[in-house]
Amino acid sequence: MKIDFIDSIEKITKEDWEAVLSSKYPFLKYEFLKALEVTNCVSPEQGWTPLHLIASENKTIMAIMPLYIKTDSQGEFIFDWSWADAYYRNGLNYYPKLVSSIPFTPASGPRILITDETRSREVIQEISKALKQITEESDFSSVHILLASRDEI
């Protein structure tokens, strides 16, 4: 399985993204996430840099995970400023961190979109390895999966 990280939703076709989206959850729709990007609502200047995860096998997309590099905690609806302060007091950087979330949306929902549920355990294991690797290589403090749906917890 190959894991790639893309810095814009436009690096994948709408058809490929929507083929993986099995629910009608509106905040994961290609058009919604693209609109956030093209209007610069999510951008490095806003503290939300897209870095979406794409898992594929034989050039077929198996899974997608919306991801963002966060340089602050604005727009997450997870109030972790005390965590950031604790990191700072101990000489550590809390930012940048890697976040799977829907920007500015305090609604729970799917965060890992998988095409073949019979392989979900395997896919999640590969995604976990890739997230650990990119966190270490890119010096992110941590990975956060925010407001995931109940069945993903």
Model-derived regions: residue spans:
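N-acyltransferase acceptor-side catalytic subdomain
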Residues: M1-I153
